[in-house]
Amino acid sequence: MRSLHIWCYLSKCVILICLVSRLKTIARLFWTVSQPRLGSTHKDKQHLAWGKAFRTQVYPIGIEPDEIVRQASGPLPPKLAQLKAELKNVQNIFSVERLDYSKGLPERFQAYEALLEHYPQHHGKIRYTQIAPTSREEVQAYQDIRHQLETEAGRINGKYGQLGWTPLYYLNQYFDRKLLMKIFRYSDVGLVTPLRDGMNLVAKEFVAAQDPANPGVLVLSQFAGAANELTSALIVNPYDRDEVAGALNQALTMPLTERISRHAEMLETIVKNDIDNWQATFISDLKAVTPRRSQCQLPDNISSCSKLA
C-alpha cells in the first residue's frame, strides 16, 4: 500500500468508515502501513486519525454448514454413483476454482506433477480432478491461462498416464453447486492453493461436506484467508511445488484417526463462525458504534498526497 502514490487518499477514505472489518492479517497490515504517516493514534482496536475515530475488528465470513451437509448427503445422481463405483480403488484429489490467475492453477498442476515424479507408488492409484469454469473469457490473459492449463494437462497425462489410467482430469465447465458438494464428500483430498485469496469459502465447504466418520484431508494455501481459521488443514506455500507435493502425499497416506481429528477441529471452527454468527456479530458491533455528528466528506483530490520514495 505504501508504494501507491494515492496511499493517503485511500487511507482517508477507509478511515471515514466507522467500522473496518475483514481478516486479522489485513487489519494489521492496514494499520501497519497507515499509522506512521497519518499522525494517528490507536489503543487496542480503537483508532483516531484526522480527527475521526474508527475501529478495526476481524469478522471472517462463514458458510451455512448445515445446508452443505444436506446437499452433500443423500443418494448420488446415477452418473456420479457409477463414477464412484468405477473409482472405488482410486484415491481422488479434487479442486474447484473459477478460472483466474490468482487461484494458482498452473502452479497446482506443477505440484501434482511433482507428486507423480517424487512418489511413483501412487501411479495408477490416484486421480486429480480440476474443475475451473471460464471466467472473463473476453480477456486475453484469462484465455492464455485456459490454454496453458489445457496444454499442461495433456503433457502430464501423456507423460505419466497408462492404459486404463488418466492421472489428471481438467474440466473447463460449470457444475451445479449441489453436485459439487456430493463430489466433495467422496473426495479423499481437497486441494485449495490460491496464490492470494481474501478468504476462499471453497475450503470451508469442502470440510463441511465431509463424512465425519471417514473425512477427506484439506491441503490449503497459507495465502488464503481461510488458513487463519482452518489451522488443522495441511498448510502449504503454493509457490513451492515440492512442498505441495509432499503435503498431497501426506494427505493420501494419512491414518483415519488423524483425519478424523483434523476434520473435527476444523468443523468446530466452521460451525462456531458460520454465516449467521458473522452477520449477527458484525451488525451488533456496527449498531454499537456512536454515530458521528458531522457528515463525513471524501477528500476532493489526492494532490496533497506526497509521493513515496
Regions found by a protein language model. Give the residues of each.
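Catalytic cores of carbohydrate-active enzymes across secretory and cytosolic contexts
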Residues: 1-309
